[in-house]
Amino acid sequence: RFRDNIITSTDLIGKVASQPVINSVLNAANKSKIMRSVLDKTLAIHKDAILPEYTNKPLLKRPGVVSYDPLNPKSKDESTGADNHSNKVTLFTTCYCNYNEPSVAESVIKLFKHNDIDIELVGREHCCGMPKMELGDLKSVTKLKNANIPLLYEKVQSGHKIVAAVPSCVLMFKQELPLLFPDDEQVKAVANAFYDPFEYLFSLHKKEKLNTEF
């Protein structure tokens, strides 16, 4: 279905919707009763459904954000020093945190840094694939898996744990991908290293290593 293919193409929508002029027009249209009525009649997106706003400053494009880009050799040297720290964490930003609510990911980063945990982002990540999987579009899921897993596996090999602030993304990497690709050793390694942020922080708390002084 055309509508389903569009709304599950989160990378594409995010990239387009975050463009300065398009961003303002789209956010205004999503609040317009007339435009919402048009969407309801043409794409069957209910006129009263709450649609997220899009930022014109995606997290991965913000100055000062530390991200790992395998195509840029200098990106490792520009990291927060995670390679020299006992707690090494990579944040999978997710489409939602990158294009809709960067403040969520920024809060995770601040919380981890408050606990002296060096954290970096994956600069060339793609959607986790959960929206496409819910459509049964396994071809797209495989394509997204092949784009994400090698990047994350490289971080796991260097001793990083991985976290994501969106639960469905955590579920995708920890449970769904291993079920879909049971013979993929890289998928297994990434799944074993993937944590919900609070799960990771609670593991520190149990070891009495969590800084709760704010």
Task: Give the location of each predicted region.
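Iron-sulfur cluster-binding electron-transfer modules in prokaryotic oxidoreductases
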Residues: R1-F214
